[in-house]
């Protein structure tokens, strides 16, 4: 079918989700319809990608994405081994990352295997998020589904702060955060880790997508954070990511630390262009 058909079907699905969200308290089974619309959107997105790129290009894009993610995990593990050897490390990870699909890497497994023997790895702390595919109707007869929280509701400052406190209570010297950041930028500024002192764990952030604060001010409680290079040139559909993890990482990312911050951050606290 034409790619425009899948775009149209995706638009219908999105429109249905919006309608269900606005009418979930007035319309019976609105949440069930919302889940159905979500499935329609997901299927349409996959079919649109397949129609647009073709099987070969889509597969190439997926493999490149996996290689860059592996490279990121590899270099974070290398940083932890060199800078926090012998310390107690806990990984903060989202629940949906514990059972990765064939198109995703097993972040926890890959990181753990790379730091084994270099640090004391504590039990991971899991940030639970809702998986719509596991939900069952609250009322089997009507088929009414339970309320599905939005990303803003699930990935908020309170939920992250509770998990950071859990990491600290576990006795960790270092928290490696692969769970990302709150969905809302203003929530990111409310995280307790920015106020942690010398007696609190150090934090390694796997990636900061949008920095609505001065990164230089973070490099007290934060041992390091990974950021994308603003001028990285790479065509996911046509290029092939380097097999060497460091080369792949350096192509797209930079690890920012207190030591290299003056060289990689500009006067506004943003990542400089032209980094090698």
Tell me the role of every PLM-derived stretch.
Residues 1-31, 39, 43-276:
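A residue-level marker of the well-folded mature domains of exported/periplasmic proteins
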């Amino acid at each position: 079918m034409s790619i425009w058909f899948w775009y149209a079907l995706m638009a219908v699905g999105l429109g249905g989700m919006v309608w269900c969200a606005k009418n979930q308290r007035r319309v019976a089974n609105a949440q069930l319809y919302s889940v159905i619309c979500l499935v329609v959107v997901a299927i349409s997105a996959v079919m649109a990608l397949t129609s647009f790129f073709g099987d070969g290009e889509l597969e190439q894009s997926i493999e490149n994405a996996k290689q860059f993610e592996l490279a990121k995990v590899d270099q974070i593990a290398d940083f932890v081994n060199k800078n926090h050897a012998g310390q107690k490390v806990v990984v903060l990870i989202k629940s949906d990352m514990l059972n990765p699909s064939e198109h995703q890497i097993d972040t926890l497994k890959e990181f753990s295997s790379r730091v084994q023997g270099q640090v004391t790895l504590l039990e991971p702390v899991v940030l639970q998020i809702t998986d719509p595919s596991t939900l069952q109707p609250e009322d089997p007869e009507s088929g009414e589904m339970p309320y599905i929280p939005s990303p803003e509701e699930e990935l908020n400052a309170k939920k992250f702060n509770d998990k950071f406190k859990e990491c600290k209570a576990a006795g960790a010297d270092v928290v490696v955060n692969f769970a990302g950041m709150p969905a809302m930028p203003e929530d990111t500024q409310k995280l307790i880790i920015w106020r942690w002192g010398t007696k609190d764990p150090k934090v390694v952030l796997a990636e900061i997508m949008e920095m609505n604060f001065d990164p230089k001010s973070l490099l007290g409680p934060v041992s390091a954070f990974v950021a994308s290079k603003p001028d990285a040139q790479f065509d996911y559909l046509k290029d092939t990511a380097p097999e060497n993890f460091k080369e792949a990482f350096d192509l797209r990312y930079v690890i920012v630390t207190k030591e290299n911050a003056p060289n990689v951050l500009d006067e506004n606290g943003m990542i400089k262009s032209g980094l090698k």
